[in-house]
C-alpha cells in the first residue's frame, strides 16, 4: 500500500520546523515498519533549484506532489491543530476529492478544523494511535474533536 504522508513542515520558526520534520520522519518510520510504501514530500529534492524562479520551483513542487497523491492508496496527515498550513490542508482536500482515504493523526489537544475532520476517513490520536492503526482492515475510527459545524 502506498501512503502519502502530509503535514506542515516549513515555518519561519526554525525550531518548530525541525520539530515537525522530526515528527514526520518518525511517522514515516512507523509506517515503513508496517510494510507500507511511504512518500514524504519534505524529501523532494529539485536538482539545481536555485536555477528556477520561486514561481517555477513552486509549480514543480506542486506538480510532483499531485502526482504522488494520485499514486497513493491513502493519505496520512499529521495534524498540529491550528498550526496546520494551507499546503497540508490542500493535500487533504485534494486526496478526499479524488476518492482517497484520509487518516488524520492528531498531535495536539487542540480542536481540529471541521473541514479536515469531515474530509477524513479515520482519525487517530498521536503517534501511538498511528502505530496501532491497522492499515489492513482500515477501521473508521473517530478519536479527535472538531469545530462545531
Regions found by a protein language model. Give the residues of each.
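Conserved catalytic or regulatory cores that recognize and/or transform ribose-phosphate-containing ligands
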Residues: 1-149
